[in-house]
Amino acid sequence: MNTRKVSVVVLIGLLALLVLAACGGGSGASTQAPTSGKTFSVETTEFAYSPNMFNASVGQPVSFKITNKGTVDHTFVIMGLDGKEAVKATIKTGGTETLQFTPAAAGNYPIVCDLPGHKEAGMQATLTVK
């Protein structure tokens, strides 16, 4: 009789584990589609961004796919409205990086290469948010 009770308890335990596994705790990842936004393709050279003017809406995610066509490394820094760095990507010579930003307020967000002398040489752009 003890063997039968143990078998029943083990069977119930296995069934409970199976049910819990099927319901699963999951990874915590959302199954919702991400909020769509704009994606801009940008090329860097010495010493420019092309294009150098971008438009977006408040709260709209923006992605920049930045390809360095130049002969030296560059950065793509979006400055906040407070004048401080909001987000930054470093793009190696011949490389491509993707930078994401969601503007929280309307205004003109400066974009610069913060490597010495690059901004001063004209490596600047603007993200206009309405």
Sequence positions of predicted segments:
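Beta-strand signatures of extracellular beta-sandwich domains
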Residues: 75-79
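Sec-dependent bacterial lipoprotein signal peptides
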Residues: 1-22
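N-terminal edge beta-strand
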Residues: 33-59
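Extracellular/periplasmic metallocenter environments
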Residues: 21, 25-27, 48, 92-130
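Ser/Thr-rich, Proline-interspersed low-complexity disordered segments
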Residues: 18, 30-35
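Beta-strand cores of secreted/periplasmic/IMS beta-sandwich domains, seen most often
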Residues: 52-72, 97-105, 109
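Generic structural detector for well-ordered beta-strands
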Residues: 41-43, 55, 65, 90, ...
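Surface-exposed loop/edge segments in extracytoplasmic proteins
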Residues: 83-89
